[in-house]
Amino acid sequence: MILLKLYLTLAAILCQSRGTTSLDLDDLMTTNPEIQNEIINKHNDLRRTVDPPAKNMLKMSWDNIIAESAKRAALRCNQNEHTPVSGRTIGGVVCGENYFMSSNPRTWSFGIQSWFDERNYFKFGFGPTRAGVMVGHYTQKERCRPEV
């Protein structure tokens, strides 16, 4: 079986300040293979639970080039302005960009779960279930695309 590779969407952007929590920012560094696995596993675990189930949901995997692009966006950390498409096109593929902001450090799983929880306000084939709710983080994470 051929393992399909889905480039990690630029969904891994945490803009945080140091808080009073016991979680240290060093514990969240994406250079740590354990953190990379946490991010990928959380995405893949949640993507398997979408309803209705996807017929061709690709498995996400870590990509260092895309991670570096996400890092550059996080260093800019402007929640009001996403990176221009030209700045997040990698290998001819336009990557999405989700932000998670917190006043204190949170785990990657917490941030990814918060994006996924937008599913409560989204109905497949219809869209947002009411005006003014945020669903774009969820729909971007769960959207399937052809092989790269």
UniProtKB/Swiss-Prot annotation:
Species source reads: Varanus acanthurus
Q: What is the lineage of its organism?
A: Eukaryota, Metazoa, Chordata, Craniata, Vertebrata
* Domain (SCP) ranges: 41-140
Q: Does the keyword Disulfide bond apply?
A: yes
What's the protein called, per UniProt? Answer: Cysteine-rich venom protein VAR6
Q: What does this protein do?
A: Blocks ryanodine receptors, and potassium channels.
Q: Keywords of this protein's UniProt record, alphabetized? A: Calcium channel impairing toxin, Disulfide bond, Ion channel impairing toxin, Neurotoxin, Potassium channel impairing toxin, Secreted, Signal, Toxin
Q: Which GO terms describe its cellular component?
A: extracellular region
Q: Which InterPro entries match?
A: CAP_dom, CAP_sf, CRISP-related
Q: How is it modified after translation?
A: Contains 8 disulfide bonds.
Assigned protein family: Belongs to the CRISP family.
